[in-house]
Structure formats: C-alpha cells, structure tokens
C-alpha cells in the first residue's frame, strides 16, 4: 500500500479527527480494517483504540479463536516479563555476569533494580530488549518471556520487541534534529508519514512527558539545545511515541540536578498508569519514593525481590539488609 492509502486506513481505525466516529464500527468491522494494514501500523492502530473498542475486539477474537497479529499478546497476562533460569556471558563465555535469574515483573508497576556497581542490574535490563545482542561475544541461556511469549522465539523479532519496549538511558541522548523530528522519528520509521497524524503523536507524546507546554512554540528547535532535564523528558517522549508496553530506564536521573530529578520522578509516577516501568537506580531513596517492586542484585545474582516496602523495612535476606543499611556497597 502507498502512504496515502495507509494513512487513510489508519484514520478509519484511530479517532484522529472529528470525521471518524468509532462508535459506529462493530468489532468485526474493526478487525477487517486491521487486516488492511502492515504489522507496525496494526500495532500502532490497536494501541490508539479506545478501551471499549479493545474490549469488543477481544470478545470477537475469542469467539473466532484467533488474534490480531500484535506479537500474539496474552491480553490478560499479569506479568509483563517472566524470567526463567537466565544466565548471561560476555567475552565468549569467559565472563559469567548473570547467574540463574528467576523473576516475575508485574504489569503497570514501577520496578526498581538496585545493587552495587557491577552487580549486573544494567546488563540484565539490556537483555530485556536484546540490546546486549549487539555486543560481540555475548551469549545466554534460559528464557525471557514478554507478555507470555518467549523473546527468543521466531514469533518476535528484535525490531518488534524494541518497538514495544522503550528505552531511556543514563545520559540524555536526543538525536541531532529538531524536537519535532526527535519524537516523530519512531512513528516515521514504522510507516506513519502523514503530517497531521505525526503532529498529533508528537503533541500527545510531549504532553505525556510533561514537556509540551515548555516547547510547543519551539518544535523546530534542536533537541540538544534543551536543558539536561528537558532533554531527558524529550527522550522519554520519543520512547513513548510508539506506545510501548514497557519503559526501561537506566539511571535516568543520575546526570540531572535535584529539580530536574524531581520532575522525572513525578513523571514516572504518572506514566505507570499506562506503562510498565523498570528503572535501574543507585539511589535507594529514589527506589523507595517511586517504585512498587524492588529487585536487589548482588554479584550477578538476584538476592531478593518483592514489594518495595517489604524489601526496605523487613528484608528477608541478611545481605539485602546490609546493603540497605550501607554495610556493603
């Protein structure tokens, strides 16, 4: 399909203008429209559907015993990730850095990874979206399930996985382009080229990242001309422009001042209403402030995992208690 036809089909499904009245479309009609799109546009359109229409479509799919091709997601899966006996090596298996990890990560929660430097928490984070696969000499054993599907199966490509799992790094990494183009970059790569649709995506993403009011009159300004805190929120907006299921954050506030850090933390608490968020942090105070669940890593092992209040107030593991109290680091 050409771009003009693609955009017309998407507008049939997504309520992007007043001419579209989704209330008049039944589940079968929506399903039929989905089949006209490529897989990336299908995923985008699905994520923009109102909850009521999603529910109707699920009912229809259950009756037909089939699913829209959206990574074959289990719609009722309680955990966003399930890790089973996972091991990871660098340097052609000469450096064993993650050992027999088993962990369930819940949906729509903030999960904090804590532990001393070099304990494996960032390495593990980058295995969730297969970024470590880009490093020569790495290998792994065990399984990582994303919404019930093994991420190493042929059902999910690395590209599809990274579309559904956004990433925000320690240092803000805006592209050398305008604010608008930074946020529109992912949707464009996934086949969304209509200017009006992109404008709506950019506005919504910047609003979700609490940045719109600060930059709405300067969207042509270079992204790297923003302040450090604004750049990090721009990177968050860019990550959520594709409506991912998960946001991975690798020490997202470590390079920011206290005021910018507070804004990011406030934003995370708002974003968890829609996304599952996993954050690596060296700040135990930050983990206590914003996370629902905490995982303590030590020398490549998971020492303890559970509700944040329990981990910090009544840890079961002596090593966890020693780390939290500052006896080890």
Curated annotation (Swiss-Prot):
Residues engaged in binding ATP? 115-122
What EC number(s) does its UniProt record assign?
Answer: 7.3.2.1
One Pfam family from the record: ABC_tran
**What does UniProt give as GO cellular component?**
plasma membrane
Database matches in InterPro entries: AAA+_ATPase, ABC_transporter-like_ATP-bd, ABC_transporter-like_CS, P-loop_NTPase, PstB-like
Q: What does the function comment of this entry state?
A: Part of the ABC transporter complex PstSACB involved in phosphate import. Responsible for energy coupling to the transport system.
Chief localization class?
Answer: membrane
Please report which protein family the annotation says this sequence is part of.
Belongs to the ABC transporter superfamily. Phosphate importer (TC 3.A.1.7) family.
This protein's name: Phosphate import ATP-binding protein PstB
Top-level taxon of origin: Bacteria
Catalysed reactions, as listed in the record = phosphate(out) + ATP + H2O = ADP + 2 phosphate(in) + H(+)
Gene Ontology annotations of biological process type: phosphate ion transmembrane transport
Q: Which Gene3D superfamilies match?
A: P-loop containing nucleotide triphosphate hydrolases
The UniProt record lists the keyword Nucleotide-binding: yes
* Cell location: Cell membrane
The alphabetized UniProt keywords are:
ATP-binding, Cell membrane, Membrane, Nucleotide-binding, Phosphate transport, Translocase, Transport
Q: What NCBIfam families is this protein classified in?
A: 3a0107s01c2
The membrane topology of this protein is:
Peripheral membrane protein
């Amino acid at each position: 399909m050409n771009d003009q036809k693609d955009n017309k089909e998407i507008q049939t499904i997504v309520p992007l203008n007043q001419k579209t009245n989704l209330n008049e479309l039944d589940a079968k009609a929506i399903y039929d429209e989905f089949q006209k799109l490529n897989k990336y546009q299908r995923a985008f359109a699905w994520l923009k559907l109102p909850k009521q229409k999603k529910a109707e479509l699920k009912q229809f799919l259950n009756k037909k015993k089939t699913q829209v091709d959206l990574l074959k997601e289990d719609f009722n899966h309680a955990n966003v990730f399930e890790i089973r006996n996972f091991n990871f090596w660098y340097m052609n298996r000469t450096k064993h850095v993650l050992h027999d990890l088993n962990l369930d990560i819940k949906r729509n929660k903030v999960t904090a990874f804590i532990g001393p430097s070099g304990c494996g928490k960032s390495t593990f984070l980058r295995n969730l979206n297969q970024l470590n696969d880009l490093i020569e000499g790495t290998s792994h054993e065990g399984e990582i399930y994303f919404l019930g599907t093994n991420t190493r199966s042929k059902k999910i490509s690395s590209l599809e996985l990274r579309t559904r799992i956004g990433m925000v790094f320690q240092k803000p990494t805006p592209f050398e382009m305008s604010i608008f183009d930074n946020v529109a970059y992912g949707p464009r790569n996934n086949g969304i080229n209509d200017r009006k649709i992109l404008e709506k995506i950019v506005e919504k993403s910047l609003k979700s990242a609490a940045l719109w009011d600060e930059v709405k009159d300067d969207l042509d300004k270079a992204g790297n001309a923003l302040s450090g805190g604004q750049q990090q929120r721009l990177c968050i907006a860019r990550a959520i422009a594709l409506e991912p299921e998960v946001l991975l954050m690798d020490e997202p506030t470590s390079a920011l001042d206290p005021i910018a850090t507070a804004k990011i933390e406030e934003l995370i608490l708002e974003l968890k209403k829609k996304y599952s968020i996993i954050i690596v942090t060296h700040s135990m105070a930050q983990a206590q402030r914003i996370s629902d669940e905490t995982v303590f890593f030590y020398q490549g092992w998971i020492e303890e995992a559970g509700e944040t209040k329990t981990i910090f107030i009544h840890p079961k593991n002596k090593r966890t208690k020693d780390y939290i109290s500052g006896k080890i680091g």
